[in-house]
């Protein structure tokens, strides 16, 4: 695009000498994007090298000037081919960076622009003082500076900061000058001086600059109570003495090292939002501002200034006052309030906002007796709505806005015995001023009379509607006022057309519309409606060609080569439809032997024609328990068997499950409303007979239909509402005024706007007006939750009496039909396994006797008795037995199963084989004579740490076990908590384990645990930015945050838990608990899921967590390679423990592998974070490893807590709080009662320590102090937010140590298994290129990581290369991919070398890899062509193999294969 670039240079007026210079003469336009709404042009230019700074500045200025002249904005970036840069050029660009938007943060600019820079060794170094927060710079500003240099054309430039000692004092003074109070004082002094100067100065002669109204006449001192409140949207620059009033939606309070308190908060007045800051001298002064809380309305006074470290304006607050701002209230008297029968929650996919809890709470706050939940096609809000309504004390009305379809849509109407080949057809089309036959007018009727494929007569008449045509109508149809002016009267045209159609079969594309329009107009004219047969070519095509994606007239004419010059002009459409008709008739005869019109409906309509039927909305409501189950069945069927684009309910299916349900007519998408507009009131009355009540909505909810010209004005909408009420009267049905609620308060409308627009054009609820580039989004209705008074005001045009009847009387009367319904059950319903209780007890004692002897030691006997009493007494035996059966089956297939969560706290689970973790106190047990010795004084944290010892009775070496975990941490102190047994199966075996559940319990009783995916915060942020871009909006950052928060949480999709399976008892039905569906509406999925989020029912049914995990797969691979049984590997191997304190055991130095310990690639301990913890703590025992595991998985357990205690020497790794169970055990050893120790553990592990009452907390603290628990321990408890269970840590550490054992003692097996199973990214050329090449690649990626430029693939590759480097340093080799040796998916060992598999090659998938191996087995590849054909490899992959030296001297072709091709 160099020619286009030169043309651009001419257009922007670049001087000729510049255009012909070396830099500009070879440049090109690489990419250009135009954002039409915001008129923003984004260019990417390619230059050989970055431009000289003066050339860049000239180019930038000319672009901006010329584009602004025509009302456009421009952004551009430069891509350069250069890899090395001149130091002077790089440094010269540094000040220029601060003129660009990316580096405009005032604080960043003020502090960093004056600093000196130096470019050396590929890095631009910024010389800064010690007082600069380098971490803050690298996190918040460095990425922007790097990106700006990239846009200048310095693509691979790195930037960093270098501390410069001599600048410290100067920079410190600048920092102190930024104290908020000094700023405020300086602003006041400056303002006073300016005012004094203004009084002394003569009146100005020149015109004064524009001053916004809100800034005029502002007094020097502002009384916050009397001050004029400034709308936030009007403040776009720095300004003093501003007063805002708004809602606080975020608060953060920080205490500085000097004790000062900074209160940062964000407010909105719904015109925009602002960030505010208040400084307090100390905590005591900060308490004066405790009204600054989320959800409070405040009036604030202060100065608006540019924040030093953000790019937004911030108010430095001087005064705060709380404002009483009450939510809207329903002020109608008790007994005279409405009930909302049509409300959506955030479970209406990408359409509505309120959480059901908020909807219910608002209805209750208003004093409404009930509120309905009617989400689109689902009932996922039912469980939360049920609980919320019970809590609020109002009646929940459980409903759904369903998509109703006819089981089959006729191809032919008014059927008759007509031979298709002999018939005469009138193929007609009408053009209208809108979609409503009642409210819009006919403006053209055209038809072609055809016989045996030939046109024998034509009809074409325009009709004057009596008013000018709208631009919308003209744009759509091409018909202008000139076409219709002076045309025949409508009645005359209708009579002539009826005569034209005599003795013919009528044909139209989408005939229901055309016939409906004609019949309404015939009736008005007093003429008979159409009675002759009618064929609908739309339905004809859908059934004849079901594989076509589109069946509109345009796509069909293109597919069959039929001319259609002016689509949407009736005469052209009619002729094209006629041509298609005879193609269809010919195919119907040849493919289906259809000869008679009567056969079209009986023999051609497909069983699944409901998939193409037009969807009509209806509201379904549950009135009793039978209805709830029927609702669940309908939701299930519509989301599985009848799903097509949306959940569909065929009418016959609805009829079969209608007991216990009542039906409302829904919104304008309902069939009664549609029939009223398209067929008239008589047809609407007939249709209404199917329903139980008529819905009418406020005129404002129908108002968007005016924009689509379905209504002329609000008066026409009001008339239609009156007709709907008349339909109800004539049908004998009550009429209810409903609000079609999509958000609660009017100001939330913008959130829905953002969500709906994010769907893009073409989404049903985001329909547009106009076509192509002229298409504009149609307005959305005002769909907030209305009070009774607001609703009465909406219907005031009906008169007070009728308005009260439909708004108040009828909805309240309808309530009497609703019984109380239980959506969520209160009990646990486990599946039935015969003799489960006896089997669990038998297996437990059998294993216990085998290990500990008979009779059992008292400590074992008492523990088993305690656990079995709880397990059997509460009906949990079947859960234990089911888990045991699943683990046993996987073990039989050769895989270990790791446990997760707290199941390892149960000794019964250990004995029956569910978990390897033994929760008894540390102990010895003799494998020969079963003698045992238990250590119960807390002196050891794990039995694996006990010193080796021989049995005192028989001399056999003792086994050591026991992790000292109380049973209470699994099933609660009273043992009645439903067990949640999570299991880690091998990822390879997980599918088989899932199928085992079906085999054990039956396919009809096992479903994947369903989840609901909602719009995440980051996604919502993207939606807001997209809305801002596409619709020409400009928001400050804090307003984007507010809008994103409002748009987040809306349902976007559904899914499934990665390993969760819900089992329903066979003595009940799944529909007693939940509907079912497919995950993400994927009807090809092999498993159905629960419709409800599994958390909503996990207290009522059995949930099995059958997760896939790499550890069991890795251990199985190591076992296969070595023949070593992993269960025989000791947990206290000295060589393995040496990994945690150094690298010597690996035979390498820390410098060789880049880390001081041997943790690379060890599960649980191999991440950068945990490696750092290992380096700090240097664990030497199993119990310390448990501590590390707990510390690394908890929240606020290590950072700012245990880490500080260890550094200060107050505690050590063994004594800090690591795992949740340790708290209970430690406190019991200290002397606290078990119940209190348990309660303290529960409060701490859930982060509730500071949330419980002061009285309760002080009671616990006193008890701990009385038992000499140290103060640091008590303080540590208060900081914790979440804790890891010790049983989980023990299971993970045991697996990790098995893997580590092979790394130490069988390294090549370890590396083979690691690269086969755990490694995520490969670079075979680097990996097989030797140590230097590996280290160079690691350095390259490390630099990118430092500059936040490394991609996810590069970061994964770095992890792989760390292990490759370690393996090479240990003396092993990495071979090349070998065409005749490499496995498809696994690494292979050949002496001291690893041979990579085919899948390790970039772009080569598993299926192709297996095909290559299979083809290889059939014979040698004689040429590259043969390799491509037989191996299924692409030309690109073969080329890569050749470049890597894998193919040797393989020729492109071989003569034999060429000869074969010729014959």
Curated annotation (Swiss-Prot):
Tell me the keywords, alphabetical order: Cytoplasm, DNA replication, DNA-directed DNA polymerase, Exonuclease, Hydrolase, Nuclease, Nucleotidyltransferase, Transferase
Quickly give the catalysed reaction: DNA(n) + a 2'-deoxyribonucleoside 5'-triphosphate = DNA(n+1) + diphosphate
Q: Which residues form the Exonuclease domain?
A: 425-581
Q: EC number(s) of the enzyme? A: 2.7.7.7
Q: What class of enzyme is it?
A: transferase
Q: Check the record and name the InterPro entries matching this protein.
A: DNA_pol3_alpha_NTPase_dom, DNA_pol3_finger, DNA_PolC-like_N_II, DNA_PolC-type_N_I, DnaE2/DnaE/PolC, DNAPol_HHH, DnaQ, Exonuclease_RNaseT/DNA_pol3
GO annotation (BP), single: DNA-templated DNA replication
What is an example of a GO molecular function annotated in this UniProt entry?
DNA binding
Q: Where in the cell is it found?
A: Cytoplasm
Q: What is its main location?
A: cytoplasm
In the UniProt record, which is one GO cellular component term? Answer: cytoplasm
PANTHER family, per the entry: DNA POLYMERASE III POLC-TYPE (PTHR32294:SF5), DNA POLYMERASE III SUBUNIT ALPHA (PTHR32294)
Question: Which HAMAP family does the annotation name?
Answer: DNApol_PolC
Q: Belongs to which family?
A: Belongs to the DNA polymerase type-C family. PolC subfamily.
Task: Tell me, in a sentence or two, what this protein's role is.
Answer: Required for replicative DNA synthesis. This DNA polymerase also exhibits 3' to 5' exonuclease activity.
State what protein this is by name. DNA polymerase III PolC-type
Supply the source organism for this entry.
Streptococcus suis (strain 05ZYH33)
Q: What is the lineage of its organism?
A: Bacteria, Bacillati, Bacillota, Bacilli, Lactobacillales
Quick one: which gene encodes this? polC
């Amino acid at each position: 695009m160099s020619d286009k670039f030169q043309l651009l240079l001419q257009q922007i007026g670049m001087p000729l000498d510049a255009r012909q210079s070396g830099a500009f003469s070879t440049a090109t336009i690489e990419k250009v994007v135009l954002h039409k709404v915001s008129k923003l042009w984004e260019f990417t230019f390619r230059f050989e090298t970055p431009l000289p700074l003066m050339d860049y500045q000239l180019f930038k200025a000319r672009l901006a000037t010329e584009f602004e002249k025509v009302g456009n904005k421009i952004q551009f970036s430069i891509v350069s081919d250069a890899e090395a840069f001149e130091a002077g050029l790089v440094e010269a660009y540094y000040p220029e960076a601060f003129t660009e938007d990316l580096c405009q943060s005032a604080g960043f600019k003020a502090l960093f622009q004056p600093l000196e820079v130096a470019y050396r060794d590929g890095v631009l170094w910024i010389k800064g003082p010690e007082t600069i927060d380098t971490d803050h710079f690298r996190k918040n500003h460095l990425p922007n500076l790097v990106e700006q240099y990239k846009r200048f054309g310095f693509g691979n430039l790195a930037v960093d900061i270098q501390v410069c000692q001599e600048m410290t004092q100067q920079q410190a003074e600048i920092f102190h000058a930024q104290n908020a109070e000094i700023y405020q004082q300086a602003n006041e002094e400056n303002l006073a001086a300016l005012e004094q100067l203004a009084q002394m100065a003569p009146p100005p002669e020149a015109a004064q600059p524009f001053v916004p109204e809100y800034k005029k006449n502002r007094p020097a001192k502002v009384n916050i109570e009397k001050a004029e409140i400034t709308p936030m949207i009007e403040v776009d620059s720095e300004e003093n003495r501003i007063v805002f009033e708004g809602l606080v939606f975020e608060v953060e309070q920080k205490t500085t090292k000097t004790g000062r308190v900074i209160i940062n908060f964000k407010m909105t007045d719904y015109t925009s939002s602002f960030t505010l800051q208040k400084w307090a001298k100390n905590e005591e002064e900060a308490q004066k501002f405790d009204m600054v809380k989320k959800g409070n309305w405040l009036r604030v006074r202060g100065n608006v200034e540019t924040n030093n470290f953000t790019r937004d304006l911030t108010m430095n607050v001087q005064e705060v006052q709380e404002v009483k701002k009450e939510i809207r209230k329903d002020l109608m008297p008790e007994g005279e309030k409405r009930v909302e029968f049509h409300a959506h929650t955030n479970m209406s996919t990408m359409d509505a906002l309120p959480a059901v809890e908020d909807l219910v709470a608002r209805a209750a706050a208003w004093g409404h007796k009930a509120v309905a939940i009617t989400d689109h096609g689902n009932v996922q809000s039912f469980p939360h709505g049920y609980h919320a309504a019970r809590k609020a004390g109002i009646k929940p009305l459980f409903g759904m806005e369903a998509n109703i379809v006819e089981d089959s849509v006729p191809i032919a109407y008014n059927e008759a015995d007509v031979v298709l080949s002999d018939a005469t057809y009138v193929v007609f089309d009408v053009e209208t001023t809108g979609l409503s036959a009642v409210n819009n007018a006919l403006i053209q009727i055209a038809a072609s009379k055809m016989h045996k494929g030939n046109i024998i007569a034509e009809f074409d008449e325009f009709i004057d509607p009596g008013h000018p045509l709208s631009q919308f109508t003209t744009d759509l149809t091409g018909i202008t006022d000139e076409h219709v002016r002076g045309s025949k009267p409508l009645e005359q045209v209708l009579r002539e057309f009826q005569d034209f159609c005599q003795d013919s079969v009528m044909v139209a594309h989408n005939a229901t519309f055309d016939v409906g329009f004609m019949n309404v107009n015939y009736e008005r004219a007093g003429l008979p409606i159409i009675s002759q047969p009618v064929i609908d070519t739309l339905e004809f095509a859908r059934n004849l060609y079901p594989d076509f994606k589109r069946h509109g007239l345009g796509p069909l004419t293109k597919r069959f080569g039929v001319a259609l010059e002016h689509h949407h002009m009736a005469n052209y459409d009619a002729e094209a439809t006629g041509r298609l008709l005879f193609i269809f008739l010919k195919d119907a005869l040849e493919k289906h032997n259809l000869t008679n019109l009567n056969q079209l409906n009986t023999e051609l309509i497909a069983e699944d024609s409901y998939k193409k039927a037009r969807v009509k909305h209806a509201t379904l409501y549950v009135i009793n328990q039978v209805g709830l189950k029927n609702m669940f069945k309908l939701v299930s069927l519509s989301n599985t068997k009848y799903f097509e684009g949306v959940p569909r309910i065929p009418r016959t299916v609805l009829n079969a499950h209608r007991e216990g349900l009542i039906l409302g007519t829904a919104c304008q998408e309902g069939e009664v409303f549609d029939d009223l507009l398209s067929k008239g009131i008589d047809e609407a009355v007939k249709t209404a007979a199917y329903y139980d009540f008529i819905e009418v909505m406020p005129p404002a909810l129908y108002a968007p239909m005016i924009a689509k010209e379905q209504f002329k004005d609000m008066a026409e909408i009001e008339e239609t509402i009156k007709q709907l009420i008349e339909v109800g009267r004539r049908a004998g049905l009550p009429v209810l005024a409903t609000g079609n609620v999509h958000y609660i308060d009017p100001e939330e409308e913008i959130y829905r706007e953002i969500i709906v627009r994010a769907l893009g054009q073409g989404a049903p609820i985001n329909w547009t007006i106009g076509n192509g580039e002229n298409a504009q989004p149609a307005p959305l209705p005002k769909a907030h939750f209305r009070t009774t008074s607001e609703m009465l005001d909406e219907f005031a045009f009906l008169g007070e009496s009728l308005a009260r009847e439909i708004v108040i009387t009828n909805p309240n009367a309808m309530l009497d039909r609703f019984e109380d319904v239980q959506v969520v059950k209160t009990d646990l319903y486990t599946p039935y396994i015969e003799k489960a209780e006896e089997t669990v007890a038998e297996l437990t004692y059998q294993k216990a006797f085998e290990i500990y002897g008979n009779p059992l030691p008292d400590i074992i006997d008492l523990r088993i008795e305690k656990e079995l009493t709880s397990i059997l007494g509460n009906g949990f035996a079947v859960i234990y037995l089911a888990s045991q059966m699943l683990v046993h089956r996987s073990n039989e297939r050769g895989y270990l199963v790791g446990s997760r969560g707290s199941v390892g706290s149960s000794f019964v689970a250990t004995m029956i084989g569910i978990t390897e973790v033994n929760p008894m106190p540390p102990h010895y047990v003799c494998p020969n004579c079963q003698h045992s010795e238990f250590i119960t004084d807390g002196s050891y944290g794990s039995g694996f740490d006990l010193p080796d010892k021989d049995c005192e009775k028989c001399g056999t070496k003792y086994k050591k076990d026991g992790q000292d975990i109380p049973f209470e941490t699994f099933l609660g102190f009273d043992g009645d908590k439903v067990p949640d047994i999570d299991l880690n199966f091998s990822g390879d075996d997980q599918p088989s384990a899932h199928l085992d559940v079906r085999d054990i319990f039956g396919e009809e009783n096992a479903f994947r645990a369903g989840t609901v995916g909602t719009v995440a915060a980051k996604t919502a942020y993207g939606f807001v930015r997209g809305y801002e871009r596409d619709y020409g909006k400009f928001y400050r950052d804090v307003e984007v945050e507010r809008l994103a928060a409002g748009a987040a949480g809306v349902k976007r999709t559904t899914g499934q838990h990665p390993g969760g399976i819900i089992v329903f008892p066979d003595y009940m039905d799944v529909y007693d608990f939940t509907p079912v569906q497919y995950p993400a509406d994927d009807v090809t999925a092999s498993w159905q899921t629960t419709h409800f989020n599994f958390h909503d029912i996990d207290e009522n049914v059995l949930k099995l967590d059958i997760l896939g995990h790499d550890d069991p797969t890795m251990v199985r691979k190591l076992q296969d390679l070595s023949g070593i049984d992993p269960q025989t590997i000791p947990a206290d191997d000295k060589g393995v423990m040496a990994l945690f304190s150094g690298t010597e055991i690996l035979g390498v130095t820390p410098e060789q592998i880049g880390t001081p310990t041997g943790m690379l690639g060890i599960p649980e301990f191999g991440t950068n974070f945990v490696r750092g913890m290992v380096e700090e703590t240097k664990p030497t025992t199993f119990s310390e490893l448990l501590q590390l595991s707990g510390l690394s998985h908890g929240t606020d357990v290590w950072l700012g807590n245990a880490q500080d205690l260890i550094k200060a020497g107050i505690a050590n790794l063994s004594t800090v709080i690591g795992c949740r169970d340790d708290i209970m055990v430690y406190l019991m050893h200290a002397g606290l009662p078990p119940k209190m120790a348990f309660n303290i553990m529960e409060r701490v592990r859930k982060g509730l320590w500071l949330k419980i009452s002061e009285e309760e907390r002080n009671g616990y603290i006193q008890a701990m102090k009385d038992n000499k628990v140290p103060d640091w321990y008590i303080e540590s408890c208060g900081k914790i937010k979440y804790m890891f269970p010790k049983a989980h840590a023990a299971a993970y550490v045991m697996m990790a140590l098995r893997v580590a054992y092979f790394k130490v003692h069988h390294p090549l097996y370890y590396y083979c298994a690691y690269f086969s199973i755990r490694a995520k990214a490969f670079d075979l050329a680097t990996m097989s290129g030797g140590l230097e090449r590996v280290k160079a690649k690691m350095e390259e990626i490390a630099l990118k990581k430092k500059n936040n430029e490394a991609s996810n693939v590069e970061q994964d590759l770095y992890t792989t290369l760390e292990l490759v480097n370690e393996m090479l340093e240990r003396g092993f080799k990495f071979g090349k991919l070998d065409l005749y040796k490499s496995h498809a998916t696994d690494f292979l060992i050949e002496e001291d070398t690893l041979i990579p598999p085919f899948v390790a090659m970039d772009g080569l998938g598993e299926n192709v890899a297996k095909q290559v191996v299979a083809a290889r087995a059939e014979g040698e590849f004689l040429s590259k062509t043969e390799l491509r054909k037989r191996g299924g490899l692409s030309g690109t992959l073969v080329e890569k193999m050749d470049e890597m030296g894998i193919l040797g001297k393989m020729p492109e072709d071989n003569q034999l294969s060429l000869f074969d091709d010729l014959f």
